[in-house]
């Protein structure tokens, strides 16, 4: 039997062999992973840990916060603020950036996260997760500002998520492919379970909230209608629909077996480019998908090339198997 490779060993070997992971970045990723283990424990306790239900507050997007949203946010901040790897953090659950306090050493990295994606699923025991993205701070000596975070997704140096489901699985990229690690609860560490994850170019599964179909743009309606027509329509094959209402869970399925995920613009809020957050959700997930051989777009532009203008910017998201994403891009171009 081959020996188990822990996350720490994997990162050290990547650092040693490929040079993709500087020591400070390796330590930062390990701290994020430890925070995810703590969040996993809180999620697993459920009603026994008094973590279910609403916290009675709203986040910056005006969404009702769950107790676990706040707990996960605090866990990530407390785990990362003192290590000396970070200059600042930004969270979907916080209005402004969180600068590392002066009592702790400051590092060269910026951490962004959605502490608990899919939190509407908490009370019904469906998979949820943590999404994170790491950027490098500019090298000047001035203090950290919000503008330091406003980098295109192609500037990320690490990205990943941790899905809390039947197993707790950490999925990571540092720009050299995608690796998956499963939490060994007896050992207390993440163990490498899959390397060089690859998404098939073609698929027969799509993930979208069909109840919103009447609000979509015509290119998305056209694509979904063709999928629904199945083998009798222009696609010549049947499709299945999947929708978990947790981006982490839907993207994890796509990384495991292919598919296409859509959260498109809709006309109910025409002034907003989309629903999902560019910096906390779309960028890290798009990089993971691309690193696995897939593609990600807002319909008109590669997501990783979008230059953000504000911290909580929203975006339309289409990602997954390459040929399906390219078809959708062509439809948006009028082809």
Curated annotation (Swiss-Prot):
PANTHER family: FRUCTOSE-1,6-BISPHOSPHATASE-RELATED (PTHR11556), SEDOHEPTULOSE-1,7-BISPHOSPHATASE, CHLOROPLASTIC (PTHR11556:SF35)
Primary localization class, coarse: cytoplasm
One Gene Ontology cellular component: cytosol
Subcellular localization(s) per the UniProt record: Cytoplasm
Superkingdom as given in the UniProt entry: Bacteria
Top-level EC class: hydrolase
Residues the record lists as binding substrate: 117-120, 209, 275
SUPFAM superfamilies linked: Carbohydrate phosphatase
Keyword Repeat: no
Name this protein carries in UniProt: Fructose-1,6-bisphosphatase class 1 1
Organism, as annotated: Polaromonas naphthalenivorans (strain CJ2)
Molecular function GO labels: fructose 1,6-bisphosphate 1-phosphatase activity; magnesium ion binding
Alphabetical GO biological process terms: fructose 1,6-bisphosphate metabolic process; fructose 6-phosphate metabolic process; fructose metabolic process; gluconeogenesis; sucrose biosynthetic process
Subunit-structure text: Homotetramer.
Binding-site list for Mg(2+) 2: 114, 117, 281
Catalytic activity: beta-D-fructose 1,6-bisphosphate + H2O = beta-D-fructose 6-phosphate + phosphate
Cofactor note: Binds 2 magnesium ions per subunit.
Pathway, per record: Carbohydrate biosynthesis; gluconeogenesis
Cofactor(s) this protein cannot do without: Mg(2+)
Binding site for Mg(2+) 1: 92, 114, 116
InterPro entries registered for this protein in UniProt: FBPase_C_dom, FBPase_class-1, FBPase_N, FBPtase
Family from the record: Belongs to the FBPase class 1 family.
The protein's Enzyme Commission number: 3.1.3.11
Alphabetical UniProt keywords: Carbohydrate metabolism, Cytoplasm, Hydrolase, Magnesium, Metal-binding
């Amino acid at each position: 039997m081959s020996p188990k490779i822990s996350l720490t060993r994997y990162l050290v070997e990547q650092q040693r062999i490929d040079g993709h992971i500087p020591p400070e970045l390796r330590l930062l990723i390990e701290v994020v992973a430890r925070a995810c283990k703590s969040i996993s424990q809180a999620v697993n306790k459920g009603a026994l840990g008094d973590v279910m239900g609403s916290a009675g507050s709203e986040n910056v997007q005006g969404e009702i916060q769950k107790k676990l949203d706040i707990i996960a946010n605090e866990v990530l901040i407390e785990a990362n603020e003192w290590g000396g790897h970070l200059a600042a953090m930004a969270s979907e659950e916080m209005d402004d950036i969180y600068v590392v306090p002066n009592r702790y050493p400051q590092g060269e990295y910026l951490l962004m996260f959605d502490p608990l994606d899919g939190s509407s699923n908490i009370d019904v025991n469906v998979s949820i997760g943590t999404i994170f993205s790491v950027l490098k701070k500019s090298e000047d000596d001035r203090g950290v500002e919000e503008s330091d975070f406003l980098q295109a997704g192609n500037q990320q140096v690490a990205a990943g998520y941790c899905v809390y489901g039947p197993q707790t699985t950490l999925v990571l990229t540092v720009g050299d492919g995608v690796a998956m690690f499963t939490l060994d609860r007896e050992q207390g560490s993440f163990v490498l379970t899959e390397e060089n994850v690859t998404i098939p170019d073609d698929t027969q599964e799509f993930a979208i909230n069909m109840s919103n179909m009447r609000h979509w743009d015509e290119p998305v309606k056209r694509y979904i209608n063709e999928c629904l027509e199945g083998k009798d329509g222009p696609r010549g094959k049947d499709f299945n629909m999947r929708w978990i209402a947790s981006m982490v869970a839907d993207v994890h399925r796509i990384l495991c077996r292919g598919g296409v995920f859509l959260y498109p613009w809709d006309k109910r809020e025409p002034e907003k480019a989309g629903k999902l957050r560019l910096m906390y959700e779309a960028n890290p997930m798009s990089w993971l998908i691309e690193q696995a051989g897939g593609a990600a777009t807002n319909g008109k532009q590669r997501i990783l090339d979008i230059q953000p203008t504000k911290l909580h910017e929203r975006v339309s998201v289409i990602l997954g198997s390459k040929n399906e994403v390219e078809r959708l891009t062509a439809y948006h171009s009028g082809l």
